[in-house]
Amino acid sequence: MRFQSINEINLTSVWAQLHLHQRSTRHVEMRDLFEAESDRFLNFSIDLNGFLLDFSKNRITGRSLDLLVELSKVAGLSDWVEAARLGEQINTSEHRAVMHFALRASVDDVYSVDGQNVVPVVHRELRRCFDFSEKIRQKIWCGFNGSPIRDVVNIGIGGSDLGPRLAVQALHPYALSDIRVHFVSNLDGADLAQTLEGLDQATTLFIVSSKSFSTPETLDNAYAAKAWFLQKAQGSDVSKHFVAISSNVEAVKDFGIAPEQMFRFWDWVGGRYSVWSAIGLSVMIAIGERHFRAFLDGAREMDQHFFTAPHEKNIPVVMALLGVWYNTFYGAHTHAIMPYAHGLARLPAYLQQLDMESNGKRVGRFGEMLDFDTGPVVWGEVGVNSQHAFFQLLHQGTRLVPCDFILPLRSHYAIGQHHQQLVANCLAQTEALMRGKTDTEVLEELQAAGVTGELLDALLPQKVFPGNQPSNTIVIDELSPHFLGMLLAAYEHKVFVQGVIWGINSFDQWGVEYGKQLAKRIAPELASTKPPKHDSSTNALIERYRTRGCRS
């Protein structure tokens, strides 16, 4: 069943039952559930070939999960998944298919768009990318003076930056040591200028990533990079040092990049789902074909699990249902991401775009206003750094903050007992958030330490931890290309499932357009002497720039 109008999902019986169930169980303590259920971990965890989702530390019972699974069925999740697989235009506002999972398909898979199997063209483009990346890696592709490429600069923004940047950092142990990969996304000139410091035009390759090749931030940086390059090179040398990831052949040619040095992706691939495509060229150069294929294979394994596993044993579905439970029925409003792996430091930023650009919407897929809470604010920080930043709020604040902990069991860097201590910290935090520390337990600790009288009375409430903060723990064997692929694909599918339940089109992003329109209007006004015609605040800020800012 696919909903066609406003409020149908929240007028269903299961929606009402979930509200009643939340009210009747909201004071249940997770520590009590663990004490009462010796097999709670087994009942509330899913292991997929070394990828473990432990969701036992959540405010749920078996009844909670049953109701949430029923909600997914009533929302027509299976139908929507099948529609996506069949290439139907589930991106309803832009009338496009959504087929990013075809980017990691095997040669024998069949995924069709407009009646054509797209898998062969995907593999042909991948082959072109691999061949080019191997020329860079093997020092066959050289710069204008015959020197091999030593630095690769990826210029892009949003999905053309966040995914590749995350993957290159996460998979650093698998990368070549003699080719450095850099990323430029910010329109602040400091980003490009500081990246170019110490680079040599003769040994630098630029990858300009923009599907339309008209993204202002990307093109401004690309033309500035080209100007820097031409300080030491000739115009004819551009072809050796610039390649494009785009679908706009003419714009790429106008920039000076030959069509044979343009790698393409398709309108059925959204930017935030594109790291698996030619957008991942910088990743391919860093880690090579074998490891990039392992990255794709990991994602495909999660795809097949998502397509075939029953909802109650389906990792992305369960992750999504728990998010709906807290955001829509508990009013949590935020979701924290804590990867206990330095290589995943960029994961929170990547998931911010994936989740909030997809589901940060108040309008349903058919234009109706939604009157329930949808996508959360996603935020986070890496590992123990987060403990020394915001865990005070998680442990003793006033807000419910569901958390995801991501933990590799093995490290690529065996330095003393570092990794064992890291694992201990991660597991300790999940237990502490769940269990808390009661006033009775605190009292016993203080008395055992000899604290009495007024000091005891003052310290006692300060040292109580309410606990009952929900979390998922995602455990992977190691941070490898395969497991990274599984992890990112799991979150992709999670976001899709939530969009289906909330009645949202998760594959457009109209909210990013309005600010761009105003910026185009304001930019010439900054250099003008005419009075600006905005609100008083914006007018005053424009005038302040005119008098105190630097014109360029």
From Swiss-Prot:
PROSITE patterns to which the protein is assigned, alphabetical: P_GLUCOSE_ISOMERASE_1 (PS00765), P_GLUCOSE_ISOMERASE_2 (PS00174), P_GLUCOSE_ISOMERASE_3 (PS51463)
Annotated spans, Disordered: 525-552
Gene3D superfamilies linked: 1.10.1390.10, Glucose-6-phosphate isomerase like protein, domain 1
Annotated GO MF terms: carbohydrate derivative binding; glucose-6-phosphate isomerase activity; monosaccharide binding
UniProt entry keywords in alphabetical sequence: Cytoplasm, Gluconeogenesis, Glycolysis, Isomerase
Cellular location(s): Cytoplasm
Pathway(s) it belongs to: Carbohydrate biosynthesis; gluconeogenesis; Carbohydrate degradation; glycolysis; D-glyceraldehyde 3-phosphate and glycerone phosphate from D-glucose: step 2/4
Catalytic class of the enzyme: isomerase
Superkingdom: Bacteria
Signal peptide from the UniProt entry: none
InterPro entries, per the entry: G6P_Isomerase (IPR001672), G6P_Isomerase_C (IPR023096), Phosphoglucose_isomerase_CS (IPR018189), SIS_dom_sf (IPR046348), SIS_PGI_1 (IPR035476), SIS_PGI_2 (IPR035482)
Residues forming the catalytic site: E357, H388, K516
One Gene Ontology cellular component: cytosol
Enzyme Commission number, as recorded: 5.3.1.9
GO biological process: gluconeogenesis; glucose 6-phosphate metabolic process; glycolytic process
Reaction(s) catalysed by this chain's protein: alpha-D-glucose 6-phosphate = beta-D-fructose 6-phosphate
Function: Catalyzes the reversible isomerization of glucose-6-phosphate to fructose-6-phosphate.
Family: Belongs to the GPI family.
Protein name as it appears in the record: Glucose-6-phosphate isomerase
Species the sequence originates in: Laribacter hongkongensis (strain HLHK9)
